[in-house]
């Protein structure tokens, strides 16, 4: 740490000669202090830097003051300050930036707004030395104003406390950790447009006096793995922020009451059609009500709203028809048992082929199922545009069939056997087994005859990158196969009509396939500590859901086999999953819905490494049960605490009898929340925006919470209910 070199600089908004270095410091003693003064547009600017070394940590405090005088009659100016820490090594390091980066550094400069980060920290990890150096902003920004800019401006004035963190890798020469206030996003940003125009903000020099104090902490640690290093600094910051007032939101209702509200809305989205059709029309704008188009966001493929959302049924990914039918049958009983059967029967009749291959989308206008990709005439959803072949994704086939299996389990608990449903489930399971690769993986997508589909592959990709992307969804069937093996372990009758094969032998086939898949996940994502490809709208990128599915799959294998290696895999994936969720409350912009409703980011989940935490959603809820259980089994108290934070934060801005939130009914909630702008020059997301909603919000908000509550100690269950 004592060999680190600090370069301090400033840059003005009107300056044409770029940044100006005002200090270069090599840390050679425990405490250093420098003061610099300069004139900018007639205003005197003073910057005082204090550097204090404490064992393995270095505290940096930067105080900036403007004296409140400025030239009049000239164009408004602004200023930005930066700090670079030279690590002195040219080799490629692995960077951990929570919700942004989890892999080896790329050449060039890569910096991110602090409010985009689930924790304002960057870590550089040396995999050969197993050491990490991190820079964190230990007193994160609390206030931000509106950008002073017109459409197209990428350099602009902004009165904000928000800075940026990132890195620059000059290949073969040096690695640099970067901090700037106000923020910049270089060399690309999603804030303005889809082409990635970079942004730079400058604090206004407008004749008013102001002060800004910035606190950073550098830390060097020795950690066995990259994930351990990032988790180490992440959890440490979480503890610090908790003591400094970054608390989780307080809800005006219990989790049980939250479930009741959501189920009220879900029931009102149900309708029947044709002679045998039934489903939930749960894709809508909560501000406009049932039957409306969901409000928009952008993906790699399509931008919604799109009129087709009002006449399609979705059975997997962002809409779980069979799952919501089960929820209401289980919780409401009565007429919802018969209605639920109608939903599932329609799906099995119209969407499953004889070989077990599954359509997960049905078009009411055309009265037929349709492919998730490949059909140019099919309705447009946000996750499909590939034209090279017609087929469906592994995830969107597995989820609806697993939901039918869960339904079978529930019926058996009531003393009934849905044999035809179970036979359909096993047809799909047999298809999975037949499609499984020798290494235990599956491909991301398949045609109806089982031909794999490889999509979104760029010419510059290495073969390893292609293979990783093709097989990125391999963790997804594990939970299903474990559930089926568990179900069959209690069967005493034949489940194979043709071969009269005992349930026990089928159980071993499915469990063996799950174990093989788990071994692939352990040797791939867990060993490489890189989880990607969980979602379908921005595939082949590192994302939150990939880590979730790997954690959940490994946990279910641990439950089935008792093998420690799967618990260790769940812990590795779980640690990365944790870092996708905010541990601090990023500032919200006045005049927005988020400000009006006192929205807090702590406990909310980022989505993927494109948007990072710039937009958050509630879908960490899907597997907080597995996160909680992994934490309990491994003695990781922070996993347990994060599960609790997620279970609370995810219900913000949900309409309830005490506050309709401006929505059409109770139990409605936005699909997403804008923490940073995303494509704001293209009419997409402004900071403070809300949008949506898609139907999987009911699956996450009801069943994700219910599964978690059921695992809590009895005393805590009573408190939640």
What is each PLM-predicted segment?
Residues 7-16, 224, 231-313, 341-342, ...:
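Low-complexity, Ser/Thr/Pro/Gly-enriched N-terminal "stalk/linker" regions
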Residues 262-280, 435, 501-509, 516-534, ...:
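Non-catalytic carbohydrate-binding regions of carbohydrate-active enzymes
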Residues 374-388, 409-493, 501-508, 559, ...:
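Active-site lining segments of carbohydrate-active enzymes
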Residues 252-267, 271, 325, 337-351, ...:
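Hydrophobic core segments within long, regular secondary-structure runs in both alpha-
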Residues 322-337, 399-417, 465, 476-507, ...:
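Well-ordered alpha-helical scaffold segments within catalytic/enzyme domains
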Residues 276-313, 358-393, 441-472, 530-553, ...:
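Carbohydrate-binding/catalytic loop surfaces
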Residues 6-15, 25-28, 34-41, 46-217:
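Beta-strand/loop-rich accessory regions of lumenal/periplasmic or secreted enzymes
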Residues 302-311, 316-354, 380-395, 399-401, ...:
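Aromatic- and glycine-enriched glycan-recognition loops and surfaces
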């Amino acid at each position: 740490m004592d060999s680190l070199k600090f370069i301090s600089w400033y840059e003005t908004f009107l300056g044409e000669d770029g940044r100006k270095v005002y200090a270069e410091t090599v840390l050679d003693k425990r405490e250093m202090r420098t003061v610099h003064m300069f004139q900018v547009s007639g205003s005197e600017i003073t910057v005082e830097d204090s550097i204090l070394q404490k064992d393995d940590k270095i505290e940096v405090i930067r105080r900036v003051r403007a004296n409140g005088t400025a030239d009049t009659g000239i164009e408004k100016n602004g200023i930005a300050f930066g700090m670079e820490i030279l690590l002195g090594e040219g080799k490629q390091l692995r960077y951990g930036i929570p919700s942004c980066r989890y892999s080896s550094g790329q050449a060039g400069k890569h910096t991110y707004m602090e409010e985009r980060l689930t924790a304002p920290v960057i870590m550089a990890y040396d995999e050969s030395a197993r050491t990490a150096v991190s820079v964190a902003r230990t007193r994160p920004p609390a206030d931000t104003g509106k950008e002073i800019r017109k459409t197209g401006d990428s350099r602009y004035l902004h009165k904000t406390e928000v800075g940026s963190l990132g890195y620059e890798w000059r290949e073969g020469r040096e690695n640099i950790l970067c901090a700037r206030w106000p923020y910049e996003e270089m060399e690309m940003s999603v804030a303005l447009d889809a082409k990635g125009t970079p942004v730079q903000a400058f604090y206004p020099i407008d004749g008013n006096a102001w002060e800004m104090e910035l606190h950073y902490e550098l830390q060097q640690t020795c950690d066995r793995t990259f994930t351990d290093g990032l988790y180490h600094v992440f959890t440490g910051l979480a503890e610090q922020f908790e003591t400094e007032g970054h608390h989780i939101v307080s809800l005006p209702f219990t989790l049980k009451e939250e479930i009741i509200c959501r189920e009220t809305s879900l029931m009102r989205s149900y309708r029947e059609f044709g002679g045998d059709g039934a489903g939930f029309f749960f894709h809508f704008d909560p501000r406009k009500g049932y039957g409306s188009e969901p409000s928009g966001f952008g993906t790699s493929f399509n931008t919604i709203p799109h009129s087709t959302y009002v006449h399609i049924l979705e059975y997997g990914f962002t809409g779980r028809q069979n799952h919501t039918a089960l929820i209401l049958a289980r919780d409401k009983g009565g007429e919802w048992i018969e209605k639920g059967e109608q939903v599932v029967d329609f799906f099995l009749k119209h969407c499953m082929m004889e070989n077990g291959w599954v359509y997960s989308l049905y078009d009411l206008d055309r009265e037929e199922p349709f492919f998730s990709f490949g059909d140019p005439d099919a309705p447009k959803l946000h996750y499909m545009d590939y034209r090279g072949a017609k087929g469906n994704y592994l995830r969107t086939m597995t989820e609806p069939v697993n939901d039918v299996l869960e339904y079978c389990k529930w019926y058996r608990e009531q003393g009934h056997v849905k044999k035809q449903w179970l036979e359909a489930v096993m047809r799909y399971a047999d298809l999975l087994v037949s499609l499984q690769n020798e290494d235990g993986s599956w491909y991301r997508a398949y045609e109806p005859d089982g031909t794999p589909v490889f999509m979104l592959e760029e010419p510059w990709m290495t073969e390893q990158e292609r293979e990783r992307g093709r097989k990125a969804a391999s963790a997804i069937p594990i939970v299903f196969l474990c559930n089926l093996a568990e179900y069959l372990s209690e069967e005493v009758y034949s489940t194979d009509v043709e071969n009269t094969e005992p349930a026990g032998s089928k159980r071993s086939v499915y469990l063996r396939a799950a174990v093989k898949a788990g071994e692939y996940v352990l040797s791939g994502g867990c060993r490489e500590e890189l989880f990607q490809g969980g979602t379908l709208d921005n595939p082949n990128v590192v994302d939150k859901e990939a880590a979730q599915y790997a954690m959940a799959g490994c946990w279910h294998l641990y439950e089935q086999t008792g093998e420690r290696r799967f618990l260790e895999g769940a812990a590795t994936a779980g640690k990365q999953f944790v870092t996708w969720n905010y541990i601090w409350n990023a500032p919200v912009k006045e005049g927005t819905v988020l400000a009006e409703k006192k929205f807090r980011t702590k406990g909310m989940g980022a989505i993927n490494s494109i948007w990072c935490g710039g937009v958050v959603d509630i879908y960490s809820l899907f597997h907080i049960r597995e996160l909680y259980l992994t934490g309990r089994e491994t003695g990781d108290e922070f996993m347990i605490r994060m599960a609790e934070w997620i279970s609370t934060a995810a219900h913000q801005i949900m309409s309830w009898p005490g506050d309709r939130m401006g929505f059409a009914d109770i139990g409605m909630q936005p699909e997403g929340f804008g923490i940073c702008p995303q494509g704001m020059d293209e009419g997409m997301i402004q900071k403070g925006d809300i949008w949506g909603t898609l139907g999987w919000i009911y699956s996450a908000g009801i069943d994700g919470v219910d599964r978690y509550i059921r695992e809590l100690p009895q005393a805590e269950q009573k408190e939640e209910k």
